Amino acid sequence: MELVPSARAELQSSPLVNLSDAFPSAFPSAGANASGSPGARSASSLALAIAITALYSAVCAVGLLGNVLVMFGIVRYTKLKTATNIYIFNLALADALATSTLPFQSAKYLMETWPFGELLCKAVLSIDYYNMFTSIFTLTMMSVDRYIAVCHPVKALDFRTPAKAKLINICIWVLASGVGVPIMVMAVTQPRDGAVVCMLQFPSPSWYWDTVTKICVFLFAFVVPILIITVCYGLMLLRLRSVRLLSGSKEKDRSLRRITRMVLVVVGAFVVCWAPIHIFVIVWTLVDINRRDPLVVAALHLCIALGYANSSLNPVLYAFLDENFKRCFRQLCRTPCGRQEPGSLRRPRQATTRERVTACTPSDGPGGGAAA
C-alpha cells in the first residue's frame, strides 16, 4: 500500500474531521493499492470504511435526534429560564452541529474522495473546531456555575441569571470563532492521486503552523479547561463535605447535589471521550512513532470515533440522570408538537401566575438561574 508524504507535507488537514487526510504519512491516498496504482482498494481499507460508516450513522442518528429533542424540550418547557438549561442548550446545539457533518464524512470514506465541493469542505472543517471549543468552554462554564451555586449561594443570586448565562454563551461562540473562522478560511479542496481531498492549507512553513495549531488545540481545548473544572469540583467537594445543609432546605439541597452530579458526569464523559484523541494527536505530532503500523492507524480511527460519539452521549446521560428530562423525552415522543397533556407528567409544584412550571425541566429549580 503506497503511503502519501510525511506529516510535514505542504498541505495539512484537520486532525479530527477528514481522517485519511489528517496525518498524511499514515493513510493511503484515495484509490491507491499496494502497488501504488490508482483505482484499486484493499479489503482491509474497504472493511474499515464500512465499519466507520456504520458507526458514524449510529452516532448521527442518536446524536442528532437526541440533541434536537433536548433543545426543543428546553425551549418548550422551561423557556430558557434557568442558567443550567441555557448552558445545556448551548452544548446540545454544538453537538447537533457536529453530528450533522457525519453523513458527509461517511460518504468521503466510502468514495475515497471529497465530492461535495469547497464550500461544504469549509463548513464541515470549521464546525468540527467550533464543536470542540464550544463544548469544552460550555462545560467549563457549567462547572463554574455549579461552583458558584454550591460555594457562594448568595453571590449566585446575582451571577446565575438567565441574561448573564445567555451573554456567556454568546461570548463562548465569539471565542470559538477565533479558531473556527481561520479554519474556514484555510479549508480548501485539492486534487491528490486522482481524487479530491478536503484539507487545511497552512501558511508557509506549513509544518510549523500545523504543529503550533495542534499544540494550541491541546492546551486551550483540553488541558486548561480541564484544570479549571478540576479546581471547581475540588472546591465543591470540600464544601459539600463540610456543610450538611447548603441552602437551609433539604429538598433544595437534594436538587443542588443532583444537578452537580449530573454536570460532573457529563464533564467526565467528555474527558473520557476526548482525552484519547487529544493525547494521540500530540504524541503523533511530537514523538517519532511508526505511523504505518496498522494497529496505530486503527487506534487513531478509534480515538476519533470516540470523540464524535460524545456528541450522541449527552442526551442519553440527561435521560438516565435526570427524571424530569426522562419524563420530558417521553412526553415529546408521545404528544405531537410537545403539547402538554392535562395531568400528565406533572407533580404538585408551586408556580407563579406569571410562569407555568412543568415537570419537564432539568432539576434546576423553577423560574431562575440561581435556584439550584
Curated annotation (Swiss-Prot):
Transmembrane among the record's keywords?
yes
Which of the residues are on side Extracellular? 1-47, 111-122, 187-206, 285-299
- The chain's Cytoplasmic topological domains, given as residue ranges, are 76-85, 145-163, 239-261, 322-372
Topologically, how does it sit relative to the membrane? Answer: Multi-pass membrane protein
Q: Which residues cross the membrane?
A: 48-75, 86-110, 123-144, 164-186, 207-238, 262-284, 300-321
Q: Name one GO cellular component term.
A: presynaptic membrane
Q: In which tissues is it expressed?
A: Brain, with high concentrations in the basal ganglia and limbic regions.
Sites of glycosylation? N18, N33
Gene3D superfamilies according to UniProt: Rhodopsin 7-helix transmembrane proteins
Task: From the UniProt entry, list the residue stretches annotated as the region Disordered.
Answer: 340-372
The Swiss-Prot or TrEMBL record annotates one GO molecular function as: G protein-coupled enkephalin receptor activity
Q: Which positions anchor the lipid (S-palmitoyl cysteine)?
A: C333
Physiological role: G-protein coupled receptor that functions as a receptor for endogenous enkephalins and for a subset of other opioids. Ligand binding causes a conformation change that triggers signaling via guanine nucleotide-binding proteins (G proteins) and modulates the activity of down-stream effectors, such as adenylate cyclase. Signaling leads to the inhibition of adenylate cyclase activity. Inhibits neurotransmitter release by reducing calcium ion currents and increasing potassium ion conductance. Plays a role in the perception of pain and in opiate-mediated analgesia.
Could you say which protein family the record assigns here? Belongs to the G-protein coupled receptor 1 family.
**Official protein name in the record:** Delta-type opioid receptor
- Species source reads Mus musculus
Taxonomic placement:
Eukaryota, Metazoa, Chordata, Craniata, Vertebrata
Q: What gene makes this protein?
A: Oprd1
